[in-house]
Amino acid sequence: MISFNNVSKLYESAGQSVHAVEDVTLSVEKGEIFGIIGFSGAGKSTLLRLVNMLERPTAGTISIDDKDITSLSTKELRKLRQRIGMIFQSFNLFNSRTVFGNIAYPLKLAKVPKNEIKERVNELLKFVGLEDKANYYPEQLSGGQKQRVGIARALATSPDILICDEATSALDPETTTEILNLLKKVNREYNLTILLITHEMHVVKEICHRVAVMEKGKVIEEGKLFDVFTQPKTKTTQNFVRSVINDHLPESVLAKIQNGGQIYRLTFTGEETGQPVLSYIAKNYNVDVNVLYGNIIELQNVLFGNLLVELQGEQREIQKALQHLRLQVQLKEVEAHAS
C-alpha cells in the first residue's frame, strides 16, 4: 500500500545539513494499523508529511499502490490528497464553523452536491457518536469530542489512508482509550490503512499491528507488534517497552533477596501463561520458589507475561527444576543488580 524506499529528507540550517529522515525503507500493508514511535526530533512527523507530499524527499521514492508519488503532477497530487485523511494533536478545527460545517468542509472543496454532503455528514456524525452535536461549535466541545469531529472530517472524502499525528497526546487516559477504540472501528469497518505516529508506547500497544521505532531520523527497529514488544533489540526500543512492561526489580525487593539464592526471568507466551509451572517444581523438586516480581499483558489477543523468581535449595535440585522449566517457558538467569 505505502512504500518508503531509501527515503531521506535533508534540511539546511545555519549553513549545516540536518537529516530529518535518513535512508528509511518501510512498507505499510493495506488495511493495517502501522505505528511509528520515537522521541521528539526522531523524524516521525517529517516522515508523515512526506506521504502526502507536504514535504518532498531529498532522496529516495515513496509509492502508494505501486505508484511513485514523488513524480506526480499538481493535478495528480491533488487527487492523491483526497485519498489521504489526516487528524492532528491540536484538532485543527475551524472555530467559526459548526461541527456539521467542519465535517462538510472537505466535501465542499471537492464540489460534492449539497444533498450528498448532508447525507455523508449525517452518516459520519452517527459513526463517531456525535449525532446530537451537529450544530455545536468547537468551543462547546470537550477534547475527545473535538477529536471525533477531526476523525469524521478526515473520513469525509472516503480516503484509503488515515494519517494520525500524535492524535491522542492532548487527551486524558480515558478519552485516549475511547479515541483508540474509534480508530480501531474505522480500521475494521472501512478497511482503512492507518499510519500513526506517537511517543507513547501504550498507544502502539493498544492499536497497532506493526510498529517502527525511529531515532535521529533513522528506523532502528521494525516488525510485528508482538515481536517488537517481546524481543526488543535496541536500547531505545527496550526503554519504550519498559514504559508499558516494567521488568525492573524495585530496590525494596532487591533488598529482600536472600544470600545464595539464584534469580531467573521466566517469560510466558500465549497458553504458557495458564500453566502452573512454579507449583509443579515446588511439589516435585526440593526447591523453594520466591516470586519477586511479575506482570502480564495482552498483545494482539495473545497473553505475554514475565516473572522474576528466586530459587533456593541444593544446587542439584535447582538444576533439575531449571531443566523442567526450560521445557515449559523461556528462561534466563539474571544478576540481582541488573534486574
From Swiss-Prot:
Give UniProt keywords alphabetically.
Amino-acid transport, ATP-binding, Cell membrane, Membrane, Nucleotide-binding, Translocase, Transport
Sequence ranges assigned to domain ABC transporter in this UniProt record: 2-241
Q: How does it sit in the membrane?
A: Peripheral membrane protein
Can you name a GO cellular component term? plasma membrane
Q: Which transformation does this protein catalyse, written as a reaction? A: L-methionine(out) + ATP + H2O = L-methionine(in) + ADP + phosphate + H(+); D-methionine(out) + ATP + H2O = D-methionine(in) + ADP + phosphate + H(+)
Q: Which domain of life is it from?
A: Bacteria
Q: Where located?
A: Cell membrane
Q: For binding ATP, which residues are annotated in this chain's numbering?
A: 38-45
Query: What GO molecular function annotation could you give as one example from this UniProt entry?
Result: ATP hydrolysis activity
Coiled-coil spans in chain: none
What Pfam families does this protein's entry cite? Answer: ABC_tran (PF00005), NIL (PF09383)
Q: What is the main EC category here?
A: translocase
Q: Keyword Mitochondrion, does the record have it?
A: no
Question: What the protein does?
Answer: Part of the ABC transporter complex MetNIQ involved in methionine import. Responsible for energy coupling to the transport system.
> Subunit structure, briefly?
The complex is composed of two ATP-binding proteins (MetN), two transmembrane proteins (MetI) and a solute-binding protein (MetQ).
Q: Which family does it belong to?
A: Belongs to the ABC transporter superfamily. Methionine importer (TC 3.A.1.24) family.
Question: What is the designated name of this protein?
Answer: Methionine import ATP-binding protein MetN 2
Species name: Bacillus cereus (strain ATCC 14579 / DSM 31 / CCUG 7414 / JCM 2152 / NBRC 15305 / NCIMB 9373 / NCTC 2599 / NRRL B-3711)
